[in-house]
């Protein structure tokens, strides 16, 4: 375009005329020559300009290429510099947080006030999923290098500012469960988690997704991983004591035990009846349970068989007698065909016979060769008879050994029937009976005469055995309150009965105070010394048909015990004059 525009300008007539007139003044050459030279110069100049332009264009093209190359390099470098930002933007776009968690359904409860107000729900929605209570879920860990946390949703709440929170009951992975002495608890299965009663509150947005957790008892086989994928729980982790317990242990608190039972039942409903472990596995498991429980449960020591020690130390006095039984008592039991065949039971029978022998009557004409002869300590037994024999002489009806053997055998049979399964309790009961029958003559007499049945004696407390009386009999023998109190002639202000007695005399302050109590209605009140200075003490009940005798008795204060008798009587008379109502007799 430039080139064509220049040729057009040179070929115009106006351009030709102007340079001619100017050249005439400077050159003397002819117009034709000058015109030819000028055209030639212009042509050369135009070609030179054209070549320069072409060269400039080539240079510009080269420069443009270099600039483009440099620009491309700069662009690449700029792209390299801007790539991290672009990647971060892309990551941010990929990690764009979903909508906040929101409750589902109506609220079920509201707790707290003010800033601490919480609204409770049964469900919440987050990231397109709905989560309910009692559902195990995976939670985002604090550190990305950690595995997701596992918890059961126990509560769903919404704070006053609208934030959703969940209360989770946590599971512990074996590498997270610390031991008290250091280190972590180990597991033989990578699926295993440890259940705990530790709870904590976290934002609802930390929930990743649901998961499956199976609670398998210790005596059941684990479900196959292929058929039932998910976590398994066989033990409970104590976050305080840093110990592990079995799911099947029954030492938890009632509420915690019910919680575990419900979780195990849910698992059994899903998996069905799992097969039991083999016997070897069960033995190993029981050993582990015993080792773990030694630290917190009282060790149950098996009862010691005392028979071995006692039977070994005691020798039979005769070749045919039982171990630990004297020849006399063995012969008596053999005569009455009362031997049981059990050495220990026969020994207990012999001791019971010996315990009641001191109240039995042994005829004087008994010969040394009789089966029921008295042993070497006969003189001692006779002395005991004299000491314990009652005044009415009823001991003579307890002939030895006829009156003793049937009752003693019945008592031992009743003890063995009720305590045969527990040798320790049976042995203790026999020792208690032998001791009390020896030291309480009333108990022995009531056993032999049939007043107390063997079953009744077995159920008597140590105090009752010592007294020889049951609780009902002891209550009947206790005197009434009226028998223990001094009855007065004062009339009760509540029931208007003349059954008021003096319960107590209280010494306090300036004078004595007397506590009066009505036997009929139980009403109690206090009276001053002046009011009760002269009281009527009711004597023993008279015979039927005779009038009651009233005796006036002057009650003196404990402070006046040291005063002369005349002075004390004078004081009481003056008090009676001042208070005539107190000295009145009932009509």
UniProtKB/Swiss-Prot annotation:
Region (Disordered): 1-118, 371-396, 539-587
Protein name per Swiss-Prot or TrEMBL: ASI1-immunoprecipitated protein 3
Domain TFIIS central: 344-493
Acidic residues composition bias: residue spans: 66-98
Polar residues compositional bias, start-end: 571-581
UniProtKB keywords: Nucleus, Repressor, Transcription, Transcription regulation
PANTHER family tied to this protein: BROMO-ADJACENT HOMOLOGY (BAH) DOMAIN-CONTAINING PROTEIN
Loss of function: phenotype: The mutant aipp3-1 exhibits multiple developmental defects, such as a dwarfed size, early flowering, small leaves and poor fertility. Accelerated flowering time under long-day conditions. Abnormally up-regulated expression of many genes localized at H3K27me3 and low-methylated H3K4 enriched loci associated with a higher accumulation of activated RNA polymerase II phosphorylated at 'Ser-5' (Ser5P-Pol II). No impact on vernalization. Enhanced accumulation of intronic heterochromatin (HC)-containing genes functional full-length transcripts (e.g. IBM1, At3g05410 and RPP7).
GO cellular component, as recorded: nucleus
Family matches, as CDD domains: BAH_plant_3
Swiss-Prot/TrEMBL site (Histone H3 lysine 27 trimethylation (H3K27me3) binding) positions: 140, 142, 149, 170, 172, 198, 200, 240
Tissues/organs with expression: Expressed ubiquitously.
Function: Transcriptional repressor. Together with PHD finger-containing proteins (e.g. PHD1, PAIPP2/PHD2, AIPP2/PHD3, PHD4, PHD5 and PHD6), cooperates to form a BAH-PHD bivalent histone reader complex able to read histone H3 lysine 27 trimethylation (H3K27me3) and low-methylated H3K4 histone marks in order to regulate transcription, especially to prevent early flowering; H3K27me3 reader of this complex.
Basic and acidic residues biased stretches: 560-570
Single Gene Ontology BP annotation: DNA-templated transcription
Subcellular location: Nucleus
Domain BAH: from-to ranges: 129-248
Subunit (UniProt): Interacts with MOM1. Component of the ASI1-AIPP1-EDM2 (AAE) RNA regulatory complex composed of at least AIPP1/EDM3, ASI1 and EDM2 and may contain CPL2, AIPP2 and AIPP3/BDT1. Part of the BAH-PHD bivalent histone reader complex that contains AIPP2, PAIPP2 and AIPP3/BDT1; the BAH-PHD module associates with CPL2 to form the BAH-PHD-CPL2 complex (BPC) for transcriptional repression. Binds directly to CPL2, PHD1, PAIPP2/PHD2, AIPP2/PHD3, PHD4, PHD5 and PHD6.
UniProt xrefs under PROSITE patterns: BAH, TFIIS_CENTRAL
InterPro entries noted in UniProt: BAH_dom, BAH_sf, TFIIS_cen_dom, TFIIS_cen_dom_sf
Effect seen on changing residue 170 to A: Lost binding to methylated histone H3 lysine 27 (H3K27me3, H3K27me2 and H3K27me1). Not able to rescue disruption phenotype. Not able to rescue disruption phenotype
Protein origin, superkingdom: Eukaryota
Molecular function terms, GO-annotated: chromatin binding; DNA-binding transcription repressor activity; histone H3K27me3 reader activity; histone reader activity
Effect recorded for residue 198 to A: Reduced binding to trimethylated histone H3 lysine 27 (H3K27me3)
């Amino acid at each position: 375009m430039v080139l064509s525009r220049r040729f057009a300008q040179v070929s115009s007539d106006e351009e030709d005329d102007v340079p001619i007139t100017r050249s005439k003044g400077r050159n003397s050459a002819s117009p034709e020559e000058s015109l030819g030279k000028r055209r030639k110069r212009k042509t050369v100049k135009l070609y030179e300009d054209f070549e320069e332009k072409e060269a400039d264009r080539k240079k510009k093209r080269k420069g443009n290429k270099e600039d483009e190359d440099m620009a491309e390099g700069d662009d690449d470098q700029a792209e390299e510099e801007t790539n991290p930002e672009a990647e971060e933007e892309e990551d941010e776009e990929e990690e764009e947080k979903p909508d906040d968690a929101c409750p589902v359904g109506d609220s079920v409860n509201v707790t707290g006030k003010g800033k601490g107000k919480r609204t409770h729900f049964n469900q919440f929605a987050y990231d397109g999923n709905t989560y309910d209570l009692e559902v195990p879920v995976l939670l985002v860990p604090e550190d990305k290098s950690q595995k997701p946390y596992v918890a059961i949703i126990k509560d769903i709440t919404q704070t006053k500012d609208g934030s959703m929170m969940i209360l989770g009951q946590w599971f512990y992975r074996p590498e997270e469960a610390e031991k008290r002495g250091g280190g972590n608890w180990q597991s033989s299965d990578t699926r295993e988690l440890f259940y705990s009663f530790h709870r904590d509150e976290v934002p609802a947005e930390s929930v990743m997704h649901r998961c499956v957790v199976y609670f398998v008892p210790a005596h059941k086989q684990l479900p196959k991983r292929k058929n039932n994928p998910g976590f398994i729980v066989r033990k409970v982790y104590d976050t305080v004591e840093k110990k592990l317990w079995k799911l099947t242990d029954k030492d938890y608190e009632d509420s915690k035990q019910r919680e575990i039972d419900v979780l195990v039942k849910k698992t059994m409903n899903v998996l069905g009846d799992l097969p039991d472990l083999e016997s070897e596995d069960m033995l190993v498991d029981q050993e582990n349970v015993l080792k773990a429980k030694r630290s917190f449960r009282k060790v149950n020591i098996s009862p010691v068989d005392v028979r071995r020690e006692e039977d070994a130390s005691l020798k039979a006095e005769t070749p045919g007698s039982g171990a630990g039984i004297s020849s006399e008592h063995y012969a008596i039991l053999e005569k009455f065909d009362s031997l049981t065949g059990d050495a220990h039971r026969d020994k207990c029978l012999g001791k019971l016979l010996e315990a009641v022998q001191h109240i039995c009557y042994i005829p004087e004409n008994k010969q040394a060769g009789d089966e029921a002869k008295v042993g070497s300590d006969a003189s001692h037994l006779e002395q005991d008879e004299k000491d314990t024999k009652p005044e009415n002489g009823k001991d003579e009806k307890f002939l030895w050994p006829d009156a003793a053997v049937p009752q003693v055998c019945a008592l031992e049979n009743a003890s063995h029937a009720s305590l045969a399964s527990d040798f320790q309790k049976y042995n203790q009961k026999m020792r208690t009976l032998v001791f009390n029958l020896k030291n309480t003559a009333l108990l022995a007499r009531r056993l032999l005469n049939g007043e107390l049945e063997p079953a009744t004696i077995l159920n008597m407390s140590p105090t009752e055995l010592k007294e020889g009386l049951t609780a009902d009999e002891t209550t009947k023998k206790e005197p009434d309150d009226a028998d223990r109190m001094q009855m007065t002639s004062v009339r009760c202000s509540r029931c208007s009965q003349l059954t008021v007695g003096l319960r107590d005399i209280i010494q306090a302050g300036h004078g004595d105070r007397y506590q009066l109590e009505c036997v009929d209605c139980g009403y109690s009140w206090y009276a001053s010394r002046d009011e009760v200075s002269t009281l009527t003490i009711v004597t023993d009940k008279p015979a039927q048909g005779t009038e009651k005798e009233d005796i006036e008795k002057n009650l003196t204060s404990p402070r006046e015990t040291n005063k002369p008798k005349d002075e004390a009587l004078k004081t009481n008379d003056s008090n009676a004059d001042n208070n005539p109502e107190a000295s009145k007799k009932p009509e």
